[in-house]
Amino acid sequence: TREGTAHNARPLRDGSILFAMNSVQKPDDLYRLDRNGRVTQLTAVNAARLAELDPVTFTKWNFAGANNATVWGYTLKPAGAQGKLPVAFIVHGGPQGSFNNSWSYRWNP
């Protein structure tokens, strides 16, 4: 989704779906998708800690690659960053996996 990456979905008896969702900016919390398509956040496990941090700016962009295939990229900048900044360029191979708008317990902390 635009808000992050949903995973571990489980159907509930009332027809709703319980799932976890995270993004580059925050680790997992639990959500409920009701039968009408409304999403409700159920937990905010790290809200207090995240409120102490300056959020990053997350931008998704793309360009035409080999054979005119769409290649996606992401830019993350510290809060308030302006002008030229140092760059960390991470190339991820595939097709077994890809980067997306998700929290990495390996890289984000």
Q: What is each of the regions a protein language model found here?
A:
Residues 6-109:
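Serine-hydrolase catalytic core recognition
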